[in-house]
Amino acid sequence: MATAYHNLSDYDYESVPCGKDLRIGIAVAEWNHNITEPLMKGAIDTLLEHGVSADNIIVQHVPGTFELTYASAYLAEQHEVDAVIAIGCVVRGDTPHFDYICQGVTQGITQLNVDGFVPVIFGVLTTETMLQAEERAGGKHGNKGTEAAVTALKMAGLERI
C-alpha cells in the first residue's frame, strides 16, 4: 500500500512555490460531502498558507464526482484560473457503478489536461471503504486535499519557469 508509511499531508514547505498572484479553482462534489468538505478545507487552508488570496480561490460545488470534469472545464474557461483542483470521493459498492464513475472522471480530467492550458489536479479519492476515505480526508493518512493543493501550486508554477 502506497500510504502504509506516509502521511499525505507531509511535504517540504520550501519546495512549494508562492501562490501570491495565482487564481485557483476548486470543483467539489457534494456526494460523500462528509469526505469532500474536509478535503476542500485542506486544499483551501494549504493555498492560503502559501499566499493565495481568499478572493482568488473560486469554489464550484457539483452534485457528484462525475460532474467534476464539466465543472473543472467551466472554472478554467470562465474564471481564468491558473489551476483547478477536482475534489470528489467514490466508494466501491455492490454494482459496477464505481468502475464507470472512476473511469469516466479519470478520463475526463486526463483529457482536460491534454487539451487545455490549465492544469487540472486529480483530488478524487477512489476507495474500497468509507474508512479508507476518512483516513485520507484528515485521518491517519493526512488530507488528500492538502496534497492536491500543493500539486496545484507546483503545476501552476510551470508557466512561470
UniProtKB/Swiss-Prot annotation:
Its EC number is 2.5.1.78. 5-amino-6-(D-ribitylamino)uracil binds at W31, T65, F66, E67, C89, V90, V91, F122. GO terms for biological process: riboflavin biosynthetic process. (2S)-2-hydroxy-3-oxobutyl phosphate binds at D94, T95, R136. Gene3D superfamilies: Lumazine/riboflavin synthase (3.40.50.960). It is an enzyme of class 2 (transferase). Keywords: Riboflavin biosynthesis, Transferase. It holds the Pfam family DMRL_synthase. The active site is at H97. One of its GO terms (cellular component) is cytosol. NCBIfam families: lumazine-synth. Belongs to the DMRL synthase family. This is 6,7-dimethyl-8-ribityllumazine synthase. It comes from Porphyromonas gingivalis (strain ATCC 33277 / DSM 20709 / CIP 103683 / JCM 12257 / NCTC 11834 / 2561). The gene is ribH.
